[in-house]
Design a protein with these regions (language model features):
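C-terminal (or distal) subdomains of carbohydrate-active enzymes
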Residues: 185-190, 200-204, 214-216, 248-255, ...
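N-terminal secretory signal peptides that target proteins for export/translocation
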Residues: 1-17
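Bacterial N-terminal signal peptides
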Residues: 19-29
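The substrate-binding groove and active-site-proximal loops of carbohydrate-active enzymes
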Residues: 56-72, 95-96, 103-113, 137-152, ...
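Catalytic grooves of carbohydrate-active enzymes
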Residues: 52-63, 68, 226-475, 479, ...
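CE4/NodB-like, metal-dependent polysaccharide N-deacetylase domain
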Residues: 152-179, 183-191, 285-301, 944
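N-terminal catalytic cores of secreted or lumenal carbohydrate-active enzymes
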Residues: 36-146, 162-164, 219, 223, ...
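Surface-exposed loop and adjacent secondary-structure segments within mature catalytic domains
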Residues: 122-136, 150, 182-259
């Protein structure tokens, strides 16, 4: 034997040492083993493989203003690309499409004017195509129950753009943090080509569903029959962070907020532990959690994520996985993407996977009550944007004018940004935010929504003007009198309607003295209020169309036509009789035609009372002076006003109109007079308007008006879902099977149920009660809903300065809040009547003065023949709207020839619907929701006829014959 170039002999000292070397090695190994703790015995379980899913959770806002987060996300994708190219075992899931969008915007070489760095882009897309990087099809982690109906339909549109442009494919949606979603989500995802949904649900406030962890994955089905295979990771520490904070799969990486490992954070007194011991504790927790739920499959998915973490953490995860797999062959860890896990589960267990239906919105959209003015602007954009889009589609078809796709793209991007789960003007998280960044975040949210409102108003202003604009072939128009003005009234809904129009005199110093129908010349009754606002009833304004009226003026200031009724607190017309209490709250709204009282004067609180809740404790809003109640009556309008001098709840106006089946309530809040919040261990106060209805509590159902249909609650809740409150689109209904009350709402959107809100003032010194939201239950004690108007906070506990007083979280919007409601009663629940009522209140008739009246005084651009179907939007086909090419030769305007019509059946009744269009069409095809897959060629195109199944959303592609 040779050692160091020398021959060893039996006589050499080196040989004697070498002869004892095996024994020394054995002794050292024995000593080391004695110091190493034995491997833990894990609980018995069906689970043999844990699929670990690395990703990073991004919030718009939260730690930085949205625009800075966009920059951060772009840098993050660069790091994902670098890590993937340097490590062949690297796996990653990109949480949101918006992150890729932001990265793509910045992929431009310094020497380039327009062309992008296509080689670099191709590298990322190649990794996505290979499956090593998974891409969510969802734009972001959204407050899905707050989103507008058409906005929600476009949740996966930007993914489809990536698919069409770069050839990437994904069947996975990932939405984290938000603890639940409404019943419309499976429909939207499945009809966009998405098969799988992963949700990391944050339960730090309340529950999501008790189907996790035992019953996951399951097929989650919408009322229309669409379904997705959903995996739910949920937990009090965040859900999506479970791999790091619950199961300790990575004992090396640091928590992004504390600079400690999660194990150190949650086990400060644990004492010295080896890395393997920490992991064993975590895996034991994982197995116990799933065993306790009755989990039966051999594989499980664990999300490995945290806020804004970088993909470099995967190196630590790989180290930890290798350590574990070398020591515990009985349960193996596998770094993967969600599709890998889903494919395994479906291949083995598809026949055993259950299907569940139900609503389980976590109701985090309540956070948007912190900025009620911004949220009101967002809801305005939700309704008005599809209406403006449909108007401009009609103009594009009939006027041969390019469709303004860029305006619509901006509008939807602003809405998506605010409707993402961090979107709200707020005072930040305790000790997290720097003051300057927090204030800039709030300014940006205000800017987005103010820009959205301005964009919408410009689209309608120019669009309605264009609708009336004569062509060069029309005869010149001469106004009969300089005191006559042409008023075009537009209906942005897909059914003819009679509704109130509000308009002011076209010029200062002139008053309206007459209004007539331009076609029939019939004079119309109207009223003018003390603010110079004129009201009249426009009858039978056609679907997606207009009627023209002639307004006659005279010199002079506007004077109210309403007559005050002295010392009265009661008013009536042919439909309603309204009576107020001396304190200004509503005592009675009586439906004359149905001989039915609508409100319950014996409820927990009076109708329309403003309730303040300090922390979890009920309080009253001070009213220093007795309210002044005035009743005014005119030819059309009857109103009761309540003025509360020097009070935060400054005024209420109740309006009823002859010929209109609704009573309206407008509540004004003077934010400058709100009490300073705090003093009860709380940072904020919550304000609710109380609406007790005269509907029996027996067999009481809450009808939740969503984006696509009504959910019946509590029947339609997913098992274990949060049941204390609900977010609705246009209307919330209450029915006992015989009597119904309907409450439509504009700015407010979140409602709590009776029994889930503290309404009783406790005596001073009384022991604190457990918050009502945790003790309320179904069946409800009465038919009352509390409209959560706003959350009021004035102090922020900042990271850099400590506690600061903030003058506002909505800079530039002022401190006057307006909350509009409309009330209507009925017998048995009528989904068509309720849907139309809510939609009409949220999209009022729009009036515009035009210089020249349109050649047709009344016109409908689009209409349908079924009342249970709505045209949600009409727009150019998505793959024809953005070209991104530059020509050296100036081009003529490129006209749109292909459009899509979005239809929604909202009652659950199969139907055949006929659609009338302003142009002839060459062909029609039924498409999927994202407009990239043909489903069916339609044979009946003259007129266009479509068969709809119950609750179906249909996207119909038409190719028009321009000019015909």
């Amino acid at each position: 034997m040779l050692m160091a170039g020398k021959k060893l002999t039996a006589q050499s000292g080196s040989y004697r040492i070498f002869r004892w070397l095996p024994l020394l090695v054995l002794l050292l190994a024995t000593a080391t083993t004695a110091q190493t703790p034995p491997k833990a015995r894990l609980p018995e379980s069906s689970i043999k493989t844990v699929y670990v899913i690395p990703t990073s959770h991004y919030d718009f806002g939260f730690v930085e203003p949205p625009d800075q987060v966009r920059e951060r996300a772009a840098r993050h994708i660069d790091e994902v690309l670098r890590m993937a190219e340097s490590d062949p075992d690297f796996r990653w899931t990109i949480e949101s499409v918006w992150q890729v969008n932001e990265w793509l915007k910045r992929q431009k070489p310094a020497s380039s004017v327009l062309p992008k760095d296509n080689a670099k882009i191709a590298r990322l897309m190649s990794l996505i195509k290979s499956g090593r990087i998974a891409l969510s099809t969802a734009w972001g982690s959204m407050h899905t129950d707050f989103m507008g109906a058409e906005e929600l339909n476009r949740l996966c549109y930007d993914y489809t753009v990536l698919k069409r442009t770069y050839g990437v494919e994904s069947q996975l949606a990932l939405m984290d943090d938000v603890p639940g979603h409404p019943t419309s989500i499976p429909s939207v995802l499945a009809n966009s080509g998405t098969k799988y949904l992963v949700t990391g649900l944050n339960l730090f406030l309340s529950s999501a569903t008790d189907l996790a962890p035992g019953k996951v994955p399951f097929y989650w089905q919408s009322p229309d029959g669409s379904k997705v295979l959903i995996w739910i990771s949920q937990g009090k520490r965040g859900g999506y962070v479970e791999g790091m904070t619950d199961f300790y799969l990575d004992p090396y990486s640091l928590d992004p907020y504390t600079n400690k490992t999660p194990y150190e954070m949650f086990n400060p007194n644990a004492g010295p532990k080896t890395d393997l011991q920490k992991m064993e504790e975590g895996i034991t927790e994982l197995l116990n959690r799933y065993n306790g739920g009755g989990y039966k499959y051999d594989s499980v998915m664990v999300m490995y994520a945290h806020d804004f973490v970088e993909p470099t953490n995967v190196k630590n995860l790989e180290k930890a996985v290798a350590l574990w797999n070398n020591n515990h062959p009985e349960i193996q860890l596998k770094i993967a993407t969600p599709p890998e896990f889903f494919h395994v589960i479906e291949s083995k267990y598809q026949a055993q996977i259950p299907t569940y239906k139900g609503e389980f919105s976590g109701l985090w959209s309540e956070a948007k009550t912190q900025s009620p003015l911004i949220s009101g602007l967002a809801r305005f954009a939700h309704e008005q944007t599809p209406a403006a889009e449909s108007l401009w589609s009609a103009l594009s078809m009939t006027r041969s004018i390019p469709f303004p796709v860029g305006n619509m793209s901006s509008l939807y991007d602003w809405m998506f940004t605010y409707d993402e789960h961090s979107g709200a003007g707020n005072t930040g998280w305790i000790q997290l935010n720097d003051r300057g960044l927090l204030e800039e975040q709030n300014r940006q949210y205000v800017r987005y929504m103010k820009d959205a409102r301005a964009e919408v108003e410009n689209l309608f202003s120019r669009g309605l003007s264009l609708a009336a604009q004569p062509t060069r072939y029309d005869q010149p128009f001469k106004q009969a009198s300089a005191n006559e003005f042409n008023l075009l009234v537009y209906n942005g809904l897909s059914w003819s309607r009679t509704d109130v129009v509000q308009v002011k005199s076209p010029h200062d110093g002139q008053k309206i003295v007459g209004i007539s129908d331009a076609a029939t010349k019939q004079s119309l009754a109207f009223d003018t209020d003390a603010n110079g606002q004129t009201f009249f009833l426009a009858k039978d304004v056609p679907s997606f169309g207009y009627k023209t009226f002639t307004v006659t003026t005279a010199t002079g200031q506007s004077v109210s036509t309403l007559t005050a009724l002295p010392r009265s607190t009661e008013a009536s017309n042919t439909n309603y009789r309204v009576r107020l209490r001396p304190d200004g709250n509503v005592q009675s709204i009586y439906d004359v035609r149905s001989n039915r009282e609508i409100i319950n004067d014996k409820g927990e609180l009076p109708f329309n009372e403003l309730l303040r809740v300090e922390g979890a404790n009920a309080a009253r809003v001070p009213v220093p002076n007795s309210p002044v109640i005035t009743v005014r009556k005119g030819k059309l309008l009857t109103e009761i006003s309540v003025e509360r001098a020097q009070a935060a709840f400054s005024s209420t106006v109740v309006r009823i109109y002859d010929g209109l089946e609704r009573a309206e309530i407008s509540n004004s809040i003077d934010g400058s007079r709100l009490p300073f919040p705090g003093g009860s261990g709380n940072w904020s106060d919550n304000y609710y308007f109380s609406f007790p209805f005269s509907v029996s509590k027996d067999n009481l159902k809450i009808m939740r008006g969503g984006q696509k249909w009504f959910d019946t609650l509590p029947d339609d809740y997913l098992s274990g879902a949060r049941k204390d409150s609900v977010t609705t689109q246009h209307l919330i209904g209450l029915t006992d099977g015989n009597a119904t009350a309907m409450l439509a709402h504009r700015q407010a959107f979140h409602f709590a149920y009776a029994g889930f809100v503290n309404t009783k003032l406790l005596p001073k010194g009384a022991p604190q009660e457990f918050p009502a939201m945790y003790t309320g239950k179904f069946p409800l004690p009465e038919a009352t809903v509390y409209s959560h108007a706003f959350r009021h906070t004035e102090q922020a506990d900042t990271h850099d300065l400590g506690v600061v007083n903030m003058a506002t979280v909505e800079p530039g919007l002022g401190d006057r809040y307006l909350f509009d409601y409309a009330i209507r009663a009925g017998g048995k629940w009528d989904a068509v009547k309720a849907w139309h009522f809510g939609a009409e209140f949220n999209l009022p008739l729009r009036a515009a003065y035009v210089d020249v009246p349109p050649s047709q005084p009344t016109r409908s651009f689009f209409d349908i023949n079924q009342p249970n179907v709505q045209i949600v939007s009409i727009k150019p086909l998505s793959d024809t709207v953005v070209h991104g090419e530059v020509s050296a030769t100036p081009l003529d305007p490129q006209l749109n020839k292909r459009y899509t019509i979005r239809l929604q059946e909202f009652t659950g009744r199969a139907t055949e619907v006929r659609i009338n269009l302003p142009v002839r069409i060459k062909s029609a095809t039924r498409m999927n929701l994202t407009e990239d897959v043909e489903l069916e060629k339609l044979a009946s195109i003259s007129p266009l006829t479509v068969r709809l199944e119950p609750f179906a959303t249909a996207t119909i592609l038409i190719e028009i014959e321009p000019g015909k």
